[in-house]
Amino acid sequence: MKLYASGEDYLETILILHREMGMVRSVDVSRHMAVSKPSVCHAVAVLQEGGFLAMDGDHFLHLTERGRIIAEKIYERHRFFTDHLIEAGVDPKTAEADAYRIEHVISDETFHRLKEKYQSESENKGL
C-alpha cells in the first residue's frame, strides 16, 4: 500500500502525541491537526488497513512497528529541516510550514547526505 504525505502526517502526529500524552485517541489527532473527526476516522481506517496503525478496545491509537518506523523517519526529517531553517534565519512559523512540505518530497539519499554534511560541519566547528 502506498502511503501518501497526508498518511505520513497522521503517523507523525500520533507519534508526537503519544510522546506527549502517552495515550492517543482520534479526537486528540483531530485537535492537533485541526481537521474534522470524520477525516481522522477515514485516515485511521486507511492506516489500519495498511498495517501502519492499530486501535485497541478503548479506541486508543497505537502505531504498529511499520507505522512507528515511518513516523520516526518523517519526524526526524521534520526536526532537521525546521531546526536548520530557523538557524538560517527563517521565521519559525515559516520554517515549520516549509519543513512539513520538504519532509515528504526529499529522497532518502539526499536527506542522509545533507544530514552527514551538517554533522560533519558541526564536528569540525568544535575543533
Annotate the PLM regions:
Residues 59-77:
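Basic, amphipathic "hinge/linker" alpha-helix immediately C-terminal to the N-terminal HTH DNA-binding motif
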Residues 97-127:
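C-terminal regulatory/oligomerization modules of transcriptional regulators
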Residues 2-35:
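N-terminal helix-turn-helix DNA-binding core of bacterial DNA-binding proteins
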Residues 12, 42, 97:
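DNA-binding alpha-helical recognition surfaces that contact promoter or target DNA
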Residues 26-57:
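Canonical helix-turn-helix DNA-binding module
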Residues 75-109:
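Arg/Lys-rich, alpha-helical DNA-contact motif
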Residues 6-9, 25, 66, 77, ...:
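N-terminal positioning helix adjacent to the helix-turn-helix/winged-helix DNA-binding module
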